[in-house]
Amino acid sequence: MAWRRVLSQVARNRSAYAICNEIIYANPSRILRGDTIAGGTLRNLHERYQSSYVGSFARRMRQMDSPSEASLLKEIYRSDPERVIQIFESQPSLHSNPSALAEYVKALVRVDRLEDSTLLKTLQRGIAASAREEENLGSVSENLGSVSAFRSAGQVTKDGILGTANAPIHMVTAETGQFKEQLWRTFRSIALTFLLISGIGALIEDRGISKGLGLNEEVQPSMESNTKFSDVKGVDEAKAELEEIVHYLRDPKRFTRLGGKLPKGVLLVGPPGTGKTMLARAIAGEAGVPFFSCSGSEFEEMFVGVGARRVRDLFAAAKKRSPCIIFMDEIDAIGGSRNPKDQQYMKMTLNQLLVELDGFKQNEGIIVIAATNFPESLDKALVRPGRFDRHIVVPNPDVEGRRQILESHMSKVLKSDDVDLMIIARGTPGFSGADLANLVNVAALKAAMDGAKAVTMNDLEYAKDRIMMGSERKSAVISDESRKLTAYHEGGHALVAIHTEGAHPVHKATIVPRGMALGMVAQLPDKDETSVSRKQMLARLDVCMGGRVAEELIFGDSEVTSGASSDFQQATAVARAMVTKYGMSKQLGFVSYNYEDDGKSMSTETRLLIEKEVKCFVENAYNNAKNILIKHNKELHALANALLEHETLTGAQIKNILAQVNNKQQQEHAIEAPQKTPAVPSSPAASAAAAAAAAAAAAQQAAAKAKGEIAGIGS
């Protein structure tokens, strides 16, 4: 019944709407259609009827929803959206159906006629006019009813389905029942995307990336080397081995005449910084041939096959410029031992290198020189005879080599007359050429910061101590008790080292914090050592125990600190090596034991015996250090006081302090000897007690005097 009432009302409004339409648009008179009072009145009447016509059913749309008609339009929409538009516009009864209206809007969107629909614009104005009329009634209930009706029937229309000029509709329809079509569409999109990316990648690989990586450009040799063998110091044996390669590059016929063949590859082996790269440049400079330089890491990129291609290009360019030298630094980056688990592209580069080393003729004039710090990691096929079949060891320089290297670097800086490079060379055992170059550079920077005119010996000593012992932390806040304990601790180390046969000479003692240590005693050998004797190892154990013994003698057993933990670790390691590696234990004999495999290679009894021997070595060292410090107690006090005052003492200053203490003791004994009167013979025990008391009094007096006179030493 409600539907019929709405239809009748719509019919009445429609008749009025038709009359207005006929009067306004069918009348040929310009008066009615122009901008006159009559024309304006008729147009207002026309708009009012339009609003009444549309607004009358907009307020009752909730009651007029016909599912059957909307379903019919929905089915027709799938195949023919134009038909949906025609049906909706030709049947006014559907205008009050929200579902039908939604299908009509969808059809307009699909055929792209949303902006051209006059009926849709009329519906929008009618809904807006209806809302305004409901608001003017003033009734809360009618307002709620109007809003509810408008929301239920026109919520989608107001908020987005009908759209506006400022907020156009964006609609995506998902059709049901077409899963296979959607799946095929998705698969087709993915396939096309993959083909597109593959094509672009191939194009970039062929044109763009290859040019960017330099694969299409011919490999060019490095700049001509001006380095000569005379510039390389400290590796005389390695230079002698490489001279024959220089002779071959200068005069190949000299060797080929007698059928001689030079190695295809030369592998330079040695620690970092020993001058392997400099030797290769010296060969190129001496022979005067093109020099191709590369690094093992330069061959690999993110693209598979780039490494092998670069190897081919490198050797192809070298063949065009033979005789020449190819130098590969850090060859272990590509020449490491092959593993079945490695990626295929990693093997391709190494395989190509192996082929190139065997691929060119032996007398072609191409010498391949490689350098590595880890020869044991190289693939066996790479170092076999016929490839890198000659290994030249480039070790750290000896004392004479270090002096030559220092002279070479010091020739480039201003130095004072007091510089003695032999002293620096003796004090830098184990330094490589790069370390010595860094030492000279640090000294030059120190002199420049101080405003000096030339580099002095003190600058070189400062640089050496900074490299070997770490930078000073003078800003660290340390209590007086801690400084005093550190002074006696380091004094104990130094004193035991001085009075123990086989110990290295004391180079410097300091209580200035360096690195993580509060103080340290540096010992340097007089010359380079190739092996260590049993006496030297036992002396090293005694020196390690000197710090803890000094703490016990001066401060008591209850005041010892954890500062000796590193000393104990070092002593234990030396003692264990003497027992398990060097065969220096009479109990275990000349047997080597692997102590680092958790005891798997030895029995429990053997392990206990090893621990017993290690403990015996350490305890003997402790007793030796204790006897030395008790005997030289005055020297310990004098040395500790000097460290507290000056913080750092050199080996020569320490010897001067000890010599002054000994001289004072001798003078005191010489003065006291004539003053003694003949004593009445007494028992041996009484004589010994009297002698001990006299010695103790003399020791206290000498210590007091030494403490007052030590201030002028070490300045």
UniProtKB/Swiss-Prot annotation:
The active site is at 490. Its main location: mitochondrion. It is found in: Mitochondrion. SUPFAM superfamilies: FtsH protease domain-like (SSF140990), P-loop containing nucleoside triphosphate hydrolases (SSF52540). GO terms for biological process: protein import into chloroplast stroma; proteolysis. Keywords: ATP-binding, Hydrolase, Metal-binding, Metalloprotease, Mitochondrion, Nucleotide-binding, Protease, Transit peptide, Zinc. ATP binds at residues 270-277. Its cofactor is Zn(2+). The keyword Methyltransferase does not apply. The keyword Metal-binding applies. Residues 665-685 are annotated as: Disordered. Residues 1-18 form a transit peptide. Its EC number is 3.4.24.-. It is an enzyme of class 3 (hydrolase). Probable ATP-dependent zinc metallopeptidase. This is ATP-dependent zinc metalloprotease FTSH 5, mitochondrial. It comes from Oryza sativa subsp. japonica. The gene is FTSH5.
